[in-house]
Every structure is written in C-alpha cells, then in structure tokens.
Design a protein with these regions (language model features):
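Conserved alpha-helix/loop element of class I SAM-dependent methyltransferases that forms part
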Residues: 2-17
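Conserved class I S-adenosyl-L-methionine
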Residues: 15-25
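Conserved SAM-binding loop of SAM-dependent methyltransferases across substrates and taxa
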Residues: 26-38
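Conserved SAM-binding motif I beta-strand of class I
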Residues: 41-46
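Conserved SAM/SAH-binding beta-strand->alpha-helix loop
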Residues: 48-50
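A short, conserved alpha-helix within the catalytic core of class I
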Residues: 103-115
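Conserved beta-strand signature within the Rossmann-like core of class I S-adenosyl-L-methionine
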Residues: 118-132
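Substrate-binding/catalytic lobe of Class I Rossmann-like enzymes that use SAM or dcSAM, i.e.
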Residues: 131, 137-195
Length: 195
C-alpha cells in the first residue's frame, strides 16, 4: 500500500534507472515502481528459476515496454550483474521490499548491503524494513493454531524425499517456532523426535 501511494514520489527521489530486485517473490510489490519510473529495463534476482519465470511473465504482460531480465542466483551473495546487453550502461536502482533483511544475522545483513552497494555501482537502494513486533503476535503468526506453518515446514521433508531422493520420515519430526528476543525474530525449525 505504501508503494502504491508513494510510487511517484519515490521515482522522483531516485531518478530514472534500471530496477534490480533482490528476490522477486510474486513481483507485485515492484509493479507500482516500474510504472512510476517508466523503466526500460528490470532485472530480477531470485534463487528459484520457476519463480523468476512466473513473475517475469506476469510483469512482461503489465509492462510491455520494459525489457525483463531474470538472473537465477543467490541474491544475498551476488555483488555484480552478469554480462547482458540490456544491463549495460544502465543506472541501477536496487529494490529489496518486505522485511527480509530482518531475517538476516547482523553479519549477514552487513555483507548483503555491501554486496548490494557494489552491485548497484552507486545507485540507490529502496529497502523495506519492519518495525519491531510483539512476541505474542509473531508466535501466533508462525505457530498458528490451525497448523498451517507446521504443515508448510513439514512439506519440505516430503519435497526433499521426492526431489532429492531423501528418506526422511515426516512423522519423526516436529515443527518448532521460537521467539528470539535478542534478535527480535522468530526462528523456525524441524526437530527430530528420534535420538
């Protein structure tokens, strides 16, 4: 909602350039920014090739005059863009919305920001951060009574078994979500019930 309300002001403050999004997700957050900037190039970085393809397909429909470049990589580690004709001589505007940086350790956050600064070559970074949340609210969200979070996490074991020929028995694990006061975050884990 904030991006939609203030996209024009953000575009005026950043100036023109190619948008580089760190972790594309469903690509909905970048839509208003691309519209306001009128960017001719959008570079999406994501570890999931299928997420890149799906997100860029939708964006290309909504922004037919913007060249879409997907880069499958660990966007937390990348400090330079690969060679690509559309990416040459473009001023770069970084985009890392949401609150993902809050999930990093302080050291990893600093390393990510250093890499982003190098990758953006002096261009601005639009960074989304979350305000501190109450412990009870976070625990209710990540250890919900309906068990959606646990089911999602336990599904990872099924995917591991299917996609990587693993042999983990989901019945031998339990989901745990714990509030870490010092880091102001939830840490989720699958804990073995076996010795």
């Amino acid at each position: 909602a904030l991006l939609e309300l203030h996209a024009d002001a953000i575009a005026a403050a950043t100036g023109p350039g190619m948008v580089v999004e760190f972790g594309i997700g469903n690509a909905r957050k970048v839509d208003p920014l691309l519209t306001a900037l009128g960017s001719s190039v959008f570079a999406a970085l994501d570890i999931s090739l299928s997420a890149l393809k799906e997100a860029l397909s939708g964006l290309a429909t909504r922004h037919p005059n913007t060249a879409m470049v997907g880069i499958c990589c660990d966007h937390t580690q990348l400090n330079e863009l690969p060679a690509h004709p559309a990416l040459e001589r473009q001023r770069r505007i970084g985009f890392f919305p949401g609150s993902s940086l809050g999930n990093f350790t302080p050291e990893d956050a600093v390393a990510f920001l250093r890499n982003a600064r190098q990758l953006l070559a002096g261009g601005p970074l639009l960074l989304g951060l979350d305000q501190p949340r109450e412990q009870a609210l976070m625990e209710a969200a990540y250890d919900d009574a309906a068990g959606f979070s646990a089911a999602f996490a336990l599904n990872l074991l099924q995917r591991l078994n299917r996609d990587l020929q693993g042999d983990a028995d989901p019945a031998q694990f339990r989901y745990r979500a714990r509030w870490q006061e010092q880091q102001q975050r939830i840490e989720m884990a699958l804990v073995s019930t076996q010795n």
